[in-house]
């Protein structure tokens, strides 16, 4: 199969993965309207082509906090990444580090912090949910800091899990889910051998380390669901800001008022995110929400964005709308499932090449030159 885009990697991943895993990463909440709008609204944002601008060389690097990135891209935290390829978090982290961008390890990863640190050193970020079990939160913060992690992505848009109807149909949850997953593995022998057998253990590495017992896939939804805390408020989180001495990014901001409160909280950055359309269906796409948030807090916070990004053109669009850098989640998992570490590295190269072409044809030489002037229709969502 010829692979030349994220969409090609998605097709390859669908063929290789058991349905319960493919639809877990591919699906959204409820009717998936927000998930579809994330992508569609980005495509509706036209770039402004300029000619004869003398763009001899394009610089894709950018400064983010105290890091210089080769690209304004970060691999987003994705739970259970290690179920998509053998020790998937390690493979994705290696690809990211080789390409000069950060990898963000999910707190509900298969590979624990120590395993990723052994593979790539301290060159990764760590993500954490707000959970009732404060002991677990403190434990993983201490272990990530001891491993050299200095950037924490704190997910704040998941006080309760979204209703993901696809999961019940695919076998991730619902009646006879365990049996259905076993049957699916039998008809996907490559995955069954390479990941199902050779990729063990399949527990939640960070949780198992804390509890000193294995938390397998069957227990994943129950453990996580029992630990979400919808009663949480800003004041309840102050201990985390006081405890964590590195950079802290709040992930899940969709409203300018919440972005302003993030400043008061002491955040160093935010991720404008609707969780890839996997939480509350019917909310704004991130590319629509981004300009108002950027206008409100751009001078005070580093702004990242995710959801719907499938190409380097989309990265340029998001930066033009006010982002400093972009996180990609589904896209890299498709590539990981299809071709492992090499697939993720190739995908990052595809994004880089697409960005170079887009920047050349819009007449900009560096990331800092991408502005609303790079768009032909910056006000398309206001019409």
Curated annotation (Swiss-Prot):
Transmembrane stretches, start-end: none
Ligand binding (substrate): 24, 129, 164, 278
Pfam family, one: FMN_dh
GO cellular component: plasma membrane
Keywords, ordered alphabetically: Cell inner membrane, Cell membrane, Flavoprotein, FMN, Membrane, Oxidoreductase
CDD domains, A to Z: alpha_hydroxyacid_oxid_FMN (cd02809)
Principal location listed in the UniProt entry: membrane
Residues that bind FMN: 106, 127, 155, 251, 306-330
Keyword Flavoprotein recorded: yes
Catalytic activity: (S)-lactate + A = pyruvate + AH2
Membrane-protein topology: Peripheral membrane protein
GO molecular function annotations of the record: FMN binding; L-lactate dehydrogenase activity
Domain of life: Bacteria
Places the protein is found: Cell inner membrane
Catalytic residues as annotated in Swiss-Prot or TrEMBL: 275
Family per record: Belongs to the FMN-dependent alpha-hydroxy acid dehydrogenase family.
Protein name: L-lactate dehydrogenase
Organism in which the protein naturally occurs: Bartonella henselae (strain ATCC 49882 / DSM 28221 / CCUG 30454 / Houston 1) (Rochalimaea henselae)
Species classification: Bacteria, Pseudomonadati, Pseudomonadota, Alphaproteobacteria, Hyphomicrobiales
């Amino acid at each position: 199969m010829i692979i030349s885009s994220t969409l090609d990697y998605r097709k390859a991943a669908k063929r290789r993965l058991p349905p319960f895993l493919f639809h877990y990463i591919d699906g959204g909440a409820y009717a998936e309207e927000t998930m579809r709008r994330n992508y569609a609204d980005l495509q509706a944002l036209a770039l402004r082509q300029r000619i004869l601008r003398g763009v001899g060389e394009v610089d894709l690097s950018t400064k983010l906090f105290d890091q210089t990135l080769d690209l304004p891209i970060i691999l987003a935290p994705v739970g259970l990444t290690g179920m998509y390829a053998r020790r998937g978090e390690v493979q994705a982290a290696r690809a990211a580090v080789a390409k000069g961008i950060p990898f963000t390890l999910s707190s509900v990863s298969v590979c624990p912090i120590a395993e990723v640190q052994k593979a790539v050193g301290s060159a990764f970020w760590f993500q954490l949910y707000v959970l009732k079990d404060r002991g677990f939160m403190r434990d993983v913060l201490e272990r990530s800091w001891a491993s050299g992690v200095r950037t924490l992505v704190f997910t704040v848009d998941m006080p309760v899990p979204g209703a993901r109807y696809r999961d019940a149909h695919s076998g991730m949850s619902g009646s006879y889910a365990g049996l259905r997953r076993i049957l699916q593995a039998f008809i996907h022998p490559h995955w069954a051998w390479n990941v199902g057998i050779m990729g063990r253990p399949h527990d939640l590495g960070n949780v198992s380390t804390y509890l000193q017992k294995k938390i397998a896939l069957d227990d994943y939804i129950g453990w996580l669901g029992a630990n979400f805390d919808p009663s949480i408020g800003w004041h309840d989180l102050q201990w985390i800001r006081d405890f964590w001495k590195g950079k802290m990014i709040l992930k899940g901001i969709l409203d300018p008022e919440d972005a302003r409160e993030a400043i008061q909280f002491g955040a160093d950055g935010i991720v404008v995110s609707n969780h890839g359309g996997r939480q509350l269906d019917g909310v704004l796409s991130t590319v629509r929400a981004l300009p108002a948030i950027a206008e409100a807090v751009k001078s005070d916070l580093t702004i990242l964005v995710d959801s719907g990004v499938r190409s380097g053109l989309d990265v340029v669009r998001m930066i033009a709308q006010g982002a400093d850098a972009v996180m990609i989640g589904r896209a890299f998992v498709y590539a990981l499932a299809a071709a492992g570490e090499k697939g993720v590295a190739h995908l990052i190269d595809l994004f880089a090449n697409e960005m170079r072409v887009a920047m050349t044809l819009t007449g900009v030489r560096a990331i800092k030159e991408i502005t609303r002037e790079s768009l032909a229709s910056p006000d398309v969502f206001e019409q």
